[in-house]
From Swiss-Prot:
Coiled-coil region(s): none
The protein's name: Hirudin-2A
Family under the similarity heading: Belongs to the protease inhibitor I14 (hirudin) family.
Superkingdom of the organism of origin: Eukaryota
Subcellular locations according to the entry: Secreted
Region listing for Interaction with thrombin active site, in residue ranges: 1-3
Intrachain disulfide bonds: 6-14, 16-28, 22-39
Glycosylation positions in this chain: 45
Sulfotyrosine PTM positions: 63
Biased composition (Acidic residues): 55-65
Region described as Disordered: spans on this chain: 33-65
Length: 65
């Protein structure tokens, strides 16, 4: 499953699964030592092109809490 964007709840959580899914010109910085991934300003690889409408799902609620 691929998630579209970072949350905007102050956690700055993003999921980096083989590509940058931060959007808005940001790149995904992988967390180390148990830290969360973060979207940071900077050039990243583009989102993968979606061939099906369902390729990008909304972020599940459990990630937004």
């Amino acid at each position: 499953i691929t998630y579209t964007d970072c949350t905007e709840s102050g956690q700055n959580l993003c999921l980096c699964e083989g590509s940058n899914v931060c959007g808005n010109g940001n790149k995904c910085k992988l967390g180390s030592d148990g830290e969360e991934n973060q979207c940071v300003t900077g050039e990243g690889t583009p989102k993968p092109q979606s061939h099906n409408d369902g390729d990008f799902e909304e972020i599940p609620e459990e990630y937004l809490q």
